[in-house]
Amino acid sequence: MKTEVKICGLKTAEALQRAVALGASHTGFIFFPKSPRNIEPDDAGRLAELARGRAKIVAVTVDADNDDLDEIVSALHPEVLQLHGSENPERVLAIKALYGLPVIKALPIREASDLERIAPYIGIADRFLLDAKPPAGSDLPGGNGVSFDWRLLDALDANVDYMLSGGLNASNVEDALALTGARAIDTSSGVESAPGIKDLTLMDAFFEAIRRAEA
């Protein structure tokens, strides 16, 4: 089965076009000023047209208010919203009602008890993004290049639709797929030469590793 792959934090046409050419199913644009991958909505909207119809356009936000979401949705016309902050189930439901878009809810995982965070969102979030908890002192909820113990997902209900995230790169993605059986994965820092700088060679290697895992 072909793995769904989201390349997140895209900021240039070159990186976006390479991701799509390599077979990315989702392209992620991050709207969070503290992130080195932050992009202005109008810039993201122009970039997204290079991928529209070939990969899903995902807007990634962190505890954004309605004014910010209005601006992002108007400029980008995303097909999916990824909520990567502390949005509670009621907020997720309100956002879905407001925009009529499917929602990926990101949840931080470090230990088995963190999987209990999923249950309140069942039937509300359309999919989960299971990411490693940020290291102490980090201002970023994701894109930190750290992984969690993938064996924790052995306890996950098989019906939970999720994307695996957190420190995935060409050197570990085969193991991650083999251990978890994940059908969808996400990376950002794993295909960068520096924070926010996508590296086409690393992107090539990442997809090569995924195809080996699928063989």
Curated annotation (Swiss-Prot):
UniProt entry tagged with the keyword Magnesium: no
An annotated GO BP: L-tryptophan biosynthetic process
EC nos: 5.3.1.24
Signal peptide (residue range): none
GO molecular function: phosphoribosylanthranilate isomerase activity
Biological source species: Sinorhizobium medicae (strain WSM419)
Pathways involved: Amino-acid biosynthesis; L-tryptophan biosynthesis; L-tryptophan from chorismate: step 3/5
Keywords in alphabetical order: Amino-acid biosynthesis, Aromatic amino acid biosynthesis, Isomerase, Tryptophan biosynthesis
UniProt-recorded name of the protein: N-(5'-phosphoribosyl)anthranilate isomerase
Catalytic EC class: isomerase
CDD domains according to UniProt: PRAI
